[in-house]
Amino acid sequence: MGQPGNGSAFLLAPNGSHAPDHDVTQERDEAWVVGMGIVMSLIVLAIVFGNVLVITAIAKFERLQTVTNYFITSLACADLVMGLAVVPFGAAHILMKMWTFGNFWCEFWTSIDVLCVTASIETLCVIAVDRYFAITSPFKYQSLLTKNKARVIILMVWIVSGLTSFLPIQMHWYRATHQEAINCYAKETCCDFFTNQAYAIASSIVSFYVPLVIMVFVYSRVFQEAKRQLQKIDKSEGRFHAQNLSQVEQDGRTGHGLRRSSKFCLKEHKALKTLGIIMGTFTLCWLPFFIVNIVHVIQDNLIPKEVYILLNWVGYVNSGFNPLIYCRSPDFRIAFQELLCLRRSSLKACGNGYSSNSNGNTGEQSGYHLEQEKENKLLCEDLPGTEDFVGHQGTVPSDNIDSQGRSCSTNDSLL
């Protein structure tokens, strides 16, 4: 987001006004510009490359095209737009110590900045709600949230984000009335984001704090449910081993099925942890900035401008973190390796997804996901009237597991 005050005048550059030698000062300034230019270029490259990789992986491999990963795609698009249309111009603003793109692009650039942050936090909020229904109502989940409904939700997120970001800025509702702000608005070379108090507080609440509170509340409920289900798994396994040891010895398949059931459940909870890391990282990166954003308009001189800009860039850097976090998922990790030609014959884009295995043979129905489609396997179920996870024989497609079992939703590729 834009810098408050005369941000382009200092922008964390070394203060050479007290240097005794002009040449030394100039050399320091040039070294600072080169160093910061390299760092900012690497940040832009990481954001763009990582999120293009995520979007391409989901688009290419059908196994990754789940409802949750549709929302992940929306999140990656917001980060990609941030890396292409926001961060480079912010870097140029800092390095050139002035704005060279005109008043129109200044406001448009600021609007895109607010749009990306708002779309990201709202998408994370939607993901939290998605996981809540997936783990608490798996029988209804697939009919409740289809891929078409997910597309509509994503569209609504971007429409709402666009209205809350572009409308107030393009209509100039954000503008402050003090003389320094008026002078900046009139100058083509000034793009410091002076705002009035009402806009700063209202936009922070609507675009960040409300979605954040919803996200934290819902995801805390999700983790409570996940913890309860893990305790149920432990109890069920203990009861199984205590009461049915002789049956297991007669039919090893039953024991293997229960172990596999628990494995699927644990993978679902690992997916929840991955999404929790994504949400936590976003919160840690952006919360300090939004706190300072409100404090700044209430007490102008309390927060140094350097701190404001630094926290703004911490938020920018968050856009490059998510692709690294997705590497926790074997699905994404294998897909990334395939796209980067680091893994030979390990993935295959096909009509029903892709297959993966440890020996590198494509097309084989092995690998940890396609095992779910074998005959006579046991699923985790929380059937009405029972407190245990019980076995169920038959062939069940992997895409339907989350509608068959209480706590084993494998429709999430962040496993």
UniProtKB/Swiss-Prot annotation:
Give the GO terms filed under biological process for this record.
Answer: adenylate cyclase-activating adrenergic receptor signaling pathway; AMPA selective glutamate receptor signaling pathway; bone resorption; brown fat cell differentiation; cellular response to amyloid-beta; diet induced thermogenesis; heat generation; negative regulation of G protein-coupled receptor signaling pathway
**Which Pfam families does UniProt cross-reference here?**
7tm_1
The membrane topology term of the UniProt record is: Multi-pass membrane protein
Q: Does the keyword Phosphoprotein apply?
A: yes
**Which residues carry the post-translational modification Phosphotyrosine, per the record?**
141
Motif PDZ-binding per record, residues = 412-415
Glycan-modified residues: 6, 15
Q: Which SUPFAM superfamilies match?
A: Family A G protein-coupled receptor-like
| Main location, first listed in the record | membrane
Stretches assigned to the Cytoplasmic side: 59-71, 130-150, 221-274, 330-415
GO molecular function of the protein, one example?
adenylate cyclase binding
Q: Name one GO cellular component term.
A: plasma membrane
Q: Which InterPro entries match?
A: ADR_fam (IPR002233), ADRB2_rcpt (IPR000332), GPCR_Rhodpsn (IPR000276), GPCR_Rhodpsn_7TM (IPR017452)
Q: What does this protein do?
A: Beta-adrenergic receptors mediate the catecholamine-induced activation of adenylate cyclase through the action of G proteins. The beta-2-adrenergic receptor binds epinephrine with an approximately 30-fold greater affinity than it does norepinephrine.
Q: What's the protein name?
A: Beta-2 adrenergic receptor
Per the UniProt record, the lineage of the source organism begins with: Eukaryota, Metazoa, Chordata, Craniata, Vertebrata
